[in-house]
A protein has these predicted regions:
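Conserved beta-loop-beta/alpha segment of the NTase-like Rossmann-fold superfamily
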Residues: 81-156
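N-terminal glycine-rich phosphate-binding loop and ensuing alpha1 helix
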Residues: 2-67, 76
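Short helix C-cap/helix-to-loop transition motifs enriched in small/turn-promoting residues
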Residues: 71-73
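Short, glycine/charged-enriched secondary-structure capping and boundary segments
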Residues: 21-23, 65-68, 93, 132-136
């Protein structure tokens, strides 16, 4: 059986949100955050582990609000998006203070992801069907790729 990983980008600064930590803000009737729904749907679809990409300054709140609870249900790992963690040959301009975005966030998790994976935003709702489609794609024909690459982008 092929294992699959759900990578959740949760290091955003939410500059347009207007206060608070957007990805940790309750939206559900019992205080659920959007990630609660995504992780539940991903587990139901067959995902085996979660890698959260966060910032160090969010770690304590993040673990208290969701991480410690989720790791009782599914294995959890943490990657930290650092402003200066760039590919070889690149340097951060001195005036740069914001994270680099999706590509750099995913690179932050490269040492932790060992299986086929899907990447989602922490503050977007995808629905169960999206996770079923992603998981089914990741496990289809596993190990039969001849060029070493199997890339897919799904937009929801």
């Amino acid at each position: 059986m092929v294992k699959t990983t759900l990578v959740i980008m949760a290091a955003g600064i939410g500059s347009r949100f207007g206060g608070g930590i957007k990805q940790l803000t309750p939206v559900g009737p019992s205080g659920e955050i959007i990630m609660d729904y995504s992780i539940y749907d991903a587990i139901e679809a067959g995902f085996d582990e979660v890698v959260f990409i966060i910032r160090h300054d969010l770690e304590k709140d993040f673990k208290e609000i969701i991480g410690n609870r989720i790791e009782k249900v599914i294995p959890v790992k943490y990657a930290f998006q650092e402003l200066d963690d760039l590919p070889e040959g690149y340097e951060r301009p001195a005036e740069r203070t914001k994270p680099w975005g999706t590509g750099q966030a995913v690179l932050a998790a490269k040492e932790l992801v060992e299986h086929p994976f899907a990447v989602i935003n922490a503050d977007d709702y995808y629905g169960k069907e999206a996770f079923v489609k992603l998981h089914d794609y990741l496990v289809a024909d596993a190990g039969k790729k001849t060029d070493g690459y199997d890339i897919c982008m799904a937009g929801f």
